[in-house]
Amino acid sequence: MHALGHCCTVVTTRGPSHWLLLLDTHLGTLPGFKVSAGRGLPAAEVYFEAGPRVSLSRTDATIVAVYQSILFQLLGPTFPASWTEIGATMPHNEYTFPRFISNPPQFATLAFLPLLSPTSPLDLRALMVTAQLMCDAKRLSDEYTDYSTLSASLHGRMVATPEISWSLYVVLGIDSTQTSLSYFTRANESITYMRYYATAHNIHLRAADLPLVAAVRLDDLKDHQIPAPGSWDDLAPKLRFLPPELCLLLPDEFDLIRVQALQFLPEIAKHICDIQNTICALDKSFPDCGRIGGERYFAITAGLRLDQGRGRGLAGWRTPFGPFGVSHTDVFQRLELLGDAVLGFIVTARLLCLFPDASVGTLVELKMELVRNEALNYLVQTLGLPQLAEFSNNLVAKSKTWADMYEEIVGSIFTGPNGIYGCEEFLAKTLMSPEHSKTVGSACPDAVTKASKRVCMGEAGAHEFRSLVDYACEQGISVFCSSRVSTMFLERLRDIPAEDMLDWYRLGIQFSHRSGLSGPGGVVSVIDIMTHLARGLWLGSPGFYVEQQTDKNESACPPTIPVLYIYHRSVQCPVLYGSLTETPTGPVASKVLALYEKILAYESSGGSKHIAAQTVSRSLAVPIPSGTIPFLIRLLQIALTPHVYQKLELLGDAFLKCSLALHLHALHPTLTEGALTRMRQSAETNSVLGRLTKRFPSVVSEVIIESHPKIQPDSKVYGDTFEAILAAILLACGEEAAGAFVREHVLPQVVADA
């Protein structure tokens, strides 16, 4: 089989670059293809140059692939990271260097070779001769170990040392029986490197592969050497160091699959096998976050922070999350900006649900307490990612750095395939994880134990809920990683009337008796019961657990308790929430509406506000799910009611920041975090939002003036009303409709950064 090629020009934000494009014959001819602007990627068009096709044999194409991989190591990759919509006959193919996948394809469907210009003659013969020379079985100089004295195969290990800029290398010649390395030394110097990290497992290379590996002469360690006792001559211990990323790029034809199978990830700087196990564990713990989300991104983040921007090793790589011309620092800061907005939105929504009677000031105070840098700094260190905390003294100048890392993870998950749902899953299992609760050593009273069991069975009465709350208050619990917030939580929970708490329970809790976490030995204290109940009410995380007090010390099967989401889940779960029709009927639908009105401190008054709400609902150019118009009108009435819409405004403000951050992140992949922040702020000022409010039908302004006879044209009330209307759309119609509303009205108001 032969591989066809075309000369083409790739036009990106960095300007045009010329390539030889190789593709497999079975894909057929291509009329042209377009590079889409994916999340974090710039748009690019590809144009074919006139001229004959280039035809290469499979062997020659493989040589070209090897040659280009070497060039990429020397010059850095400059081709697009993700190609989509590549004609009608070509499937989607994500082609990135370095590869962060466990089993890369044996031969790349697309292979790119940089050219001086698209019109220059391509001397394939010279190219193949050059590549063949690199692949021929040539020996290293006498400075290095003579391969002719080696056995049929070699063992090696991946080794890293911070004294050499955290660059990572394959050390060829480490005996398979050797369990550790003693130290690094530099030739002709008295320096001894004592800090190093090596993989626990050996890498096996065939002798036939060694000439190819040895021929790749990069400017790495030059005359560094390492004592290698065992089967090696102690008088000539010099060995060749090879950056492992190059091994990962070589085609499978050269039998380096064992190296590829190590799944090289940046944080191998401590121990590659431990990191792989961690990634697998994270994947099992957070299956809904998406593989493109926090796990892989955190690996890249950790590795680059370890490198500390020295410009070698890890810092020289381009990640799939960053477009051309954007540094790693800029990529992380952009994701931090996005994650901060997403975190603020989810926390705001959950607090509104958890504390329906709290004032806006109290809610803001709670939110600031939950997302403060010190709390997030602690959370990052409890995620179970190994070895990172050990480097904190060297890497973290401020505690804010770790908090930024958490926000970067949230932002990365948000840009992944699961979006806001992946973020909710991640927050539910990290921000409010079981490690943050304080258990009580004493046994629960029988009354509390029985009440707990009845709660789990769905048969609890109001007095039994109250007994759990009172017991929790007496014992004291630690929630949200803050004793101050814990106290505020208990006060709010204790202030809820028992009968209302029962309504919360019946409305918001669905039971799943076949899943859930367990404490040590399957026994969890009643303090954990209340703590997990709080988490369930707020984040929909795995619920509370019951200690079954029996003579045999057997544990009851604990349920998992997802809860009432305070926004558009009502649209997506009609079975649970009933039919939100013109005249809601049934206990569930009535209770839901009553709960919303209680949370937002609203009592329907009809009149002009009802008419205005109907008018606004008809003027919205957004997708509105069927059956939600009455619900939307009720919420729009709240949005137009003075001194009542504050909580809607709080939610709308949080969603506006989140939505604008996402849109700007996708539309401007090369801008820095500072530029994106300035652009977002230009569109969310009160003056801009006030002007948008005045563009609604005149009845809206009439209602506002009726409520504020002396209102000034530039009053903050207009901007607050817009945010409240946005929140009403969010609650009634969901994120898609609210996002469309932001795109239609707010996004055009963004001022481009100079």
From Swiss-Prot:
A GO molecular function annotation here is: RNA binding
Do you know which SUPFAM superfamilies this protein is assigned to? PAZ domain (SSF101690), RNase III domain-like (SSF69065)
Q: Where does Mn(2+) 1 bind?
A: E336, D404, E407
Which cofactor does this sequence's record say it needs?
Mg(2+); Mn(2+)
Which PROSITE patterns does the entry mention?
PAZ, RNASE_3_2
Binding of Mn(2+) 2 occurs at E649, D720, E723
Q: Where is the PAZ domain?
A: 132-251
Q: Keywords in UniProt for this one?
A: Endonuclease, Hydrolase, Magnesium, Manganese, Metal-binding, Nuclease, Nucleotide-binding, Repeat, RNA-binding, RNA-mediated gene silencing
Enzyme Commission code(s) on record = 3.1.26.-
Q: Which residues form the RNase III domain?
A: 298-418, 613-734
Q: List this protein's GO terms for biological process.
A: regulatory ncRNA-mediated gene silencing; RNA processing
Cofactor: bound how, per the entry note?
A: Binds 2 magnesium or manganese ions per subunit.
Q: How does it assemble?
A: Homodimer.
Tell me, in a sentence or two, what this protein's role is.
Answer: Involved in cleaving double-stranded RNA in the RNA interference (RNAi) pathway. It produces 21 to 23 bp dsRNAs (siRNAs) which target the selective destruction of homologous RNAs.
The protein depicted here goes by the name Endoribonuclease Dicer-like
Which organism was this protein described from?
Giardia intestinalis (strain ATCC 50803 / WB clone C6) (Giardia lamblia)
Provide the taxonomic classification: Eukaryota, Metamonada, Diplomonadida, Hexamitidae, Giardiinae
